[in-house]
Amino acid sequence: MVAYALKGDIPDIEVFDKRITMAMLEKAVFDRRVLVFKAADIIMGIARWNYFWDSIPFLNMLYVPDGYTHHGVGIALLRFWEEEMETQGYTRVFTATMSQERGQHFFRKFGYCDIGNLYNDGAGLELILEKKIQMN
């Protein structure tokens, strides 16, 4: 089940998300910018976002640990996030993935299109992807 992360989830989320500081993670959870997929109180995946140009939802992290991949966890997190962003009135969302990562294929499968790239010093080329979301 997908839900917004709670304060009590932070220690488990931190195991998966090492890209931000604990203070940043706590703020993201407080600001309701972190989702968790839980089954039997076990976190099987996370999604965390911020805002590009302070106005476009940008999915910074979609992570499903080995053992939980290919079971619909990532799809559930992505769809829940997109629906939440649409409900909040956004008409497009962004994400990014490194060019050598498989994630780009996952996002394209769900309607994301390349809109640009950045050279991430030493890490390689980062692809920026966009998806238009519609109000129903």
Give the predicted meaning of each segment:
Residues M85-M98:
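Conserved GNAT acetyl-CoA-binding A-motif
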Residues F94-A96, C113-I128:
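Conserved catalytic-core motifs of GNAT/GCN5-like acyltransferases
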Residues L62-H70, M98:
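A short, internal acetyl-CoA/4′-phosphopantetheine-binding micro-motif in the GNAT/acyltransferase core
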Residues Y4-N60, P65, G116, N120, ...:
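Acetyl-CoA-dependent GNAT
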Residues L129-N136:
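Short beta-strand-to-coil "C-cap" segments at the C-terminal boundary of structured domains/repeats
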Residues L78, E101-G103, N120-E126:
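Short glycine/proline-centered loop/turn elements that form peptide/ligand docking sites
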Residues H70-E83, R108-K109:
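Conserved acetyl-CoA-binding loop-helix of GNAT-fold acetyltransferases
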